[in-house]
């Protein structure tokens, strides 16, 4: 299978890798679409402070389930899914308080661990989300859209109100 490897800052190449095998409780996914986030650009440029090399970037994606290792009453081969791209330890102070976004040991796909710029990848079933009826192209952007949705909800913006977008770089554009 092919993957995009950022070998060193500023250098990327398409490489052939062995297809991964899902562990028990994991699914093998075929990536359908992958978005390019600002963190992917930072990883390529060498300005992402947490990236190590070589690294396969990417965390915004949609995929089709190819195979499931084990039983699942939620998913089947052929389902189109996306996934939570952040892996928390669940035991640190932040996680115990429900603040998983502040996990002391977070591993983000494409930064701390290989990401979605590859044809196939494995993912724990408990991280997957089906989105029946959603176009896979749109599903690949659910993570950046959810950030905007969260901001609007948190600010309690009401219909008809105006908002100002204070910053719109390539990282914030959808």
Model-derived features: where do they sit?
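Residues that mark the start of a beta-strand
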Residues: 2, 26-28, 162
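Short, acidic/hydrophobic/Gly-rich beta-strand patch recurrent on exposed beta strands
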Residues: 5, 44-45
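Residue-level recognition of beta-strand termini and adjacent short loop/turns
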Residues: 8-10, 23
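Short glycine/threonine/proline-enriched tight-turn/helix- or strand-capping micro-motif at secondary-structure
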Residues: 11-18
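Glycine-rich beta-strand-centered segment in the early N-terminal region that forms part
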Residues: 20-34, 47-93, 132-134
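Cytochrome P450 core scaffold surrounding the K-helix E-X-X-R motif
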Residues: 39-42
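NAD(P)H dinucleotide-binding glycine-rich loop of Rossmann-like/cofactor-binding domains
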Residues: 89-164
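Residue-level detector of conserved catalytic or cofactor/ligand-binding positions
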Residues: 165-174
């Amino acid at each position: 299978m092919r993957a995009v490897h950022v070998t060193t800052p500023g250098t990327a190449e398409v490489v052939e890798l062995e297809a991964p095998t899902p562990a028990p409780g994991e699914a093998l996914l075929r990536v359908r679409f992958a978005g390019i986030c600002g963190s992917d650009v930072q990883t390529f440029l060498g300005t992402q402070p947490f990236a190590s090399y070589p690294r396969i970037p990417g965390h915004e994606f949609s995929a089709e389930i190819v195979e499931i290792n084990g039983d699942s009453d939620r998913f089947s081969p052929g389902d189109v899914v996306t996934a939570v791209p952040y892996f928390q330890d669940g035991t640190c102070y932040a996680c115990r308080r429900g603040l998983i976004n502040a996990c002391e040991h977070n591993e983000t796909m494409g930064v701390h661990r290989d990401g979605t710029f590859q044809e196939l990848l494995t993912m724990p079933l408990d991280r997957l989300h089906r989105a029946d009826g959603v176009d896979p192209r749109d599903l690949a952007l659910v993570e950046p859209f959810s950030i905007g949705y969260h901001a609007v909800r948190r600010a309690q913006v009401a219909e008809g109100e105006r908002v100002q977008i204070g910053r719109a770089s390539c990282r914030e554009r959808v």
